[in-house]
Amino acid sequence: AETFPNLSDEVRREKWQAMIDTEEESLPHYLQHVSGHKTLINMLERILAANEEILQLPKTVLLREFGDGAMSKLDRYSAIVWPNEKRQFDQSTEGNFVGVGIVIREGNTGEILVVSPIDGSPAYYGGVVPEDIITHVNGSSTSGWTVNDAVDKITGKRGTSVTLTIKRETEEESLDLTLTRDRIILRSVSGWNKKSISESGEPIWDWYIDPHNHIGYIKLTGFSKSSYADILAAIRDLQEIGEPNGLILDLRYNPGGLLPTARQISNLFIQEGSIVSGENANGDMLFDMRAYENRAYLADWPLVVLINQGSASASEIVSGAVQAHGAGIIVGQRSWGKGSVQTVHNLGADALALVKLTTQLYRLPAIDGKPGRLVHKREGSSD
């Protein structure tokens, strides 16, 4: 009410609610005579016009409320990716961005707090450390900023500079750190222990959790466009030391990512047959992703896949396919249960926002002639 004072006016609220009720009651009639798309456009135009008269809320606020409300009626994974969220969405799928390479969050009192610099990034080499508080960006105070505000100001074109004013517990005075923005690679693959950082800024991993018995370890934190290539690079590093006698693939707390990447990684361990299929709400098969024998580079390696309640979507495809084909042993806890496919559509010609719409469900490969399981969470299910 402080931000939008008209919301505290009871007369205006009642008038607004009456208008919304009228539109809702009229909707079935309009749909009988006009196409659904045209009906909704006309309704939205009337609502926006009424808002100008009654509540006078910013158009962006109203559109977001109606947009999020509409998507919430579908399922938990269908959503609008708004302009202020699109950058983070793109980063999660592309696996890279331009910036200085710091992970930040909002502190207990609203300050912009550094969680950690990314290995090999400008922030890493520039002296930023965990628990630093960013008080200014290019001289502008961060007081009252959200994390998104800070990201907007800190990121920019590659090769340009940004000055962060840092408050550090071990220093009496603030520090000004000028960093040059660069392309930051978000690695989704790591080993058992980070031994050092290379001259190019890449972490050097110890890939053997048990050197004596030659048991390798690879942790995968997401399924981005670069994850498959990163796993192949890790495998080459393993083999340079010696041929492994087994591999642990750690998918704990991996929320998933890109379906094609899940298929590629599954195929490393599976020589033939289905990896995952997709079906619509009627149970009709829409696709069947299958393994290629010439890409099953690791099919002969003994494999253990670690999962927990934080393993979802693409993680469940990989672990489920490995289990169905007997290509490895699954160890851990019941996974999250996110077995739906979202297709992404641009909103508008300039694609400043996106719509994620659930269109399919995953089905794992059949086991012993029985139909494969749907991955999607079901109330009361124990598997």
Describe the predicted segments one by one:
Residues 65, 76-116:
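PDZ/PDZ-like peptide-tail recognition elements
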Residues 6, 102-104, 206-207:
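A structural signal for short hydrophobic beta-strand segments in well-ordered beta-sheet cores
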Residues 49-50, 54-58, 82-84, 95, ...:
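Cleft-lining beta-strand/loop regions that shape enzyme active-site pockets
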Residues 363-383:
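Conserved functional hotspot residues or short segments at active or partner-binding sites
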Residues 1-78:
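Terminal targeting/pro-maturation regions of precursor/exported proteins
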Residues 179-185, 360-362, 381-382:
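A short, sequence-level motif marking secondary-structure junctions
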Residues 105, 165-169, 363:
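A generic structural motif
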Residues 342-343, 349-365:
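C-terminal "exit" segments of structured domains
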